[in-house]
């Protein structure tokens, strides 16, 4: 019925917001902002109605969660970097019906997921920064998915991504884009050295790993990448333990995915972290290579409906 039209992996560095403001950082992230705007325009051209963002700044300790409130509006200051993002206004319509559908299909496929359509919870800046540049006119509806998963299996995140695609393609009357909002390596500069590393990667080792991953992506080496993802997420300091990336690749077919990534904003350093904007073309997949769920099959597992 519905269509998953686009699947980007995007940066959300808070220095993008600083780049708008008068001061020494003004204009310094224009390439990343332009990349967001280009991806947003592609979504418009493709008829996308809803952006689903896998947000590595939404930390959760149990289950997966979907923020699908009917409307988001407020003023945001980052608790992590309040000197970077302060008093940033935001507003976007939500899509409660799609959010509930996504959760239902994920649960049916063995990945415990809760939809929150009646909540005071606002999105985090992994969602809000991209929306600032892709959705300033509230053209798109927005859903945020928790992707800073503290006690979760990457295989379950991959399964979640595939389940969300099935929900869209099998049951939704509309067109959707999935976004993995997070960096590659995410080792922040040591306190006191942030200015020195404002435009650099923390270590040659991490930069080498990131660049090798990008080479694999551009050559569609998805089988080897999926195999190494858990170790890369750990040793490479992947943002959010790379759960956003696992979700995106799960939606794309996991190790069976067969298209090269397109770099929109080339790899760049930000406060020691490795960033980019890239688009992963959506190709036909049957999900045969997506890992089965793990948590819901564990001995002693009880569903959240019983625990609460």
Feature map (PLM): residue ranges:
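Flexible, D/E/H-enriched segments
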Residues: 1-49, 61-159, 170, 191-308
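Conserved beta-ketoacyl condensing-enzyme motif
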Residues: 55-61
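Non-transmembrane, aqueous-exposed alpha-helical and coiled segments at domain scale
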Residues: 162-176
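Short, conserved secondary-structure transition motifs
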Residues: 184-190
